[in-house]
A protein has these predicted regions:
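Serine-esterase "nucleophile elbow" of acetyl-processing enzymes
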Residues: 1-48, 58-67, 182
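Alpha-helical cap/lid subdomain in secreted, periplasmic
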Residues: 57-202
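Short, flexible loop segments at the rims of nucleotide/cofactor-binding pockets, characterized by
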Residues: 47-51, 134-135
Length: 202
């Protein structure tokens, strides 16, 4: 039996979709279909609206985290939304990578990071009055920091930002709140993760 720890924000808890339709649960379904036993439900430390520092505080309160076979990290959209600087995010994100690594006994091959989705490419984004070109540029800057940190530590990074942009005009890919991804979009994330074959030798 393998145990998966998912760290993040609203995207990780699957805001506006059923709990079993979160991307991490759909991913676990696909891992199980390949013959790997995964403890369910996946253990999630995440909440809508959390920034990197708020996630770190929640992890501290949840200590000891214990030992895990897999750990995922998806965080940062709320840092960008609140106008926080990239340098501060970079430091806090790197500390969260330390936490994820510690949870899997410092095995980088057992950590999976996902990029920050582009919330500007949603019905909510279109109606919010923000400069969406600037929003996309800021998200790109955050994701560049994520890319550099993951590359330096040989940690796998899945680019889901490109999916949120590619399917932005498809109403099936947005949840009813107009902001978060739908179960169908999360299915694309889960399938993309399976295609990497990352955990094929569990």
């Amino acid at each position: 039996m393998h145990h998966l720890l998912a760290l993040g924000d609203s995207y990780t808890i699957g805001e506006a979709v059923a709990p079993d339709q979160r991307w991490v649960e759909q991913w676990a379904d696909l891992i199980q279909a390949e013959g790997h036993a995964i403890a369910r439900p996946v253990h999630v430390i995440a909440q809508t609206g959390w920034t990197t520092d708020e996630l770190a505080q929640a992890i501290t309160l949840a200590q000891p985290l214990g030992a895990w076979d897999l750990a995922t990290l998806l965080i940062g959209v709320n840092n960008q939304y609140r106008g926080r600087d990239v340098d501060g995010f970079d430091r806090e994100f790197n500390a969260l990578l330390d936490t994820a690594m510690a949870a899997v006994a410092d095995r980088p091959e057992r950590v999976q990071v996902l990029s920050i989705p582009d919330w500007g490419q949603t019905p909510f984004g279109a109606a919010c009055g923000r400069d969406l070109i600037q929003v996309s540029a800021e998200i790109d800057a955050y994701n560049q920091a994520i890319t550099q940190r993951c590359s330096a530590r040989s940690i796998a990074l899945l680019d889901v930002t490109v999916l949120t942009r590619r399917f932005s005009a498809d109403p099936r890919m947005h949840a009813e709140d107009g902001l978060h991804p739908s179960a169908a979009m999360y299915r694309l994330w889960a399938e993309a993760l399976i295609c990497t074959g990352k955990f094929g030798r569990l």
